[in-house]
Amino acid sequence: MADPPFGFGLPGGSGGSGGGGGSGGSGGSGGGSGDNPGGNPLGPLGDPQQFADALRQFADLMAWQGGAVNWDLAKNVARQTVAAEGDPSVLDADRKKIVEAVQLADLWLNEVTSFPSGVRTAQAWSRSEWVEATLPVWTTLCDPIAEKAVDALGGMISGNPEDMAGEMPAELSSALQAVTGGLGGMAGLGGGLGAMMKRIGGMMVGGQTGAAVGGLAREVVSSTDVGLPLGPEGVAALLPAGVADFGQGLSVSAEEIRIFLAMREAAHHRLFAHVPWLRSRLLAAVEDYARGITVDASALREAMPQIDPSNPEALREALSDASLFQPEDTPQQKAALARLETLLALVEGWVATVVDDAAGDRLPQAGALAEAIRRRRASGGPSERTFAALVGLELRPRMLREAGTLWADLTEARGIEPRDALWAHPDLLPTADDLANPDSFLRGATELDISDLEEGPTTEEGPATEEGPTTEDQDPGPA
């Protein structure tokens, strides 16, 4: 993998603590291990008052009972990451503009797709609200690999505590012996230390993932910007701050940008709402691939002697090493990756096609905005960075273009309803080979008898109805 899994990279790149800042190597800020005239058993870990404060915070974090990863901490770190660069509340005027843009966009989409509206309510979110609304899905996606990292950390202490002490940095071993009453105390604790290390690992992974989600919140423009259904069903949401950032450097009016991005958001919701299998299949493809990633516990164990306990970023840096996380080279893993990449390309290609058709002559700069989306993806936008970090998947711009071209050609060859009817079952959709060589698929789609599907898509409750965003859209969104 070229990148560590999502949430495991160091926030802000390599400029974090890097070489340890002022920690001073193994001596840390408290001086060398041999310079401890007061006999403070905590040594480089700080003075007693600082350590007492740290212990209180540590106890609060260790009280987490929600699973392997501390997701409460992840949410707090994500919100702090967003707030660090400013995250003002959404003004009522901006909220009204977003709601009106989604309503208009949804109306235009009625003419270019057989899928009815998938939007029950339209909202404008701050970046912190995006974090709150999407974190439940991130929890589902990140748990498989995060739990493996936490288990690997706990497994380092599952053996002989005396051996473990010899592998740890001297300062960390001394501190643990001081707390537990020497090696005998450590041996007595046994599995208790392993459980504690898992809790610590859960805190570190939660903090890392929170920083990654917070960083992503500063880049996205909507709830579906990364290509996954991250937000609540039926809630179309745009981030006014993200929309404004997207428009920087474009000679396009703010209103036109807002409507164009609202069309992309509403188009995603139509697909996710009226293709019952799509949401679960997309998320399952990510989870399946993540489950096939293994953590190299031996490499993590080898890194432990170099970790400086006085540097709080040291364990984070160890976890950010991409070499620790390796995908299994199995047919099942390759198949999961291919399914995910193809399905993401098909979703993006369909959205791009219907948005281009709906914009038509209504938005004079629709072509320029579509090109801006393509450039954003080619240079590594939120979607590309998310999947590169989450599962090591680099979305290929060529496949995205091929998918858009195929959907456009299908529209011309067969019309809107037969094109959309292909979403009735995953086996009807183009494969990766079809995207690369579309002619045979286009001929097959033309000859395929799908008359029983051409009456239009249905929901699980019965025939789909035309329904747009409601007046509930004045709801301020997630708390």
Model-derived regions, located:
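Active-site recognition of the HExxH zinc-binding catalytic motif
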Residues: 257-276, 407
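An N-terminal structural lobe/cap that precedes and organizes the functional/catalytic core
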Residues: 78, 83-96, 100, 217, ...
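Post-HExxH zinc-binding segment in Zn-dependent metallohydrolases
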Residues: 203-224, 272-324, 335-362
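Pan-zinc metallopeptidase signature
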Residues: 326-479
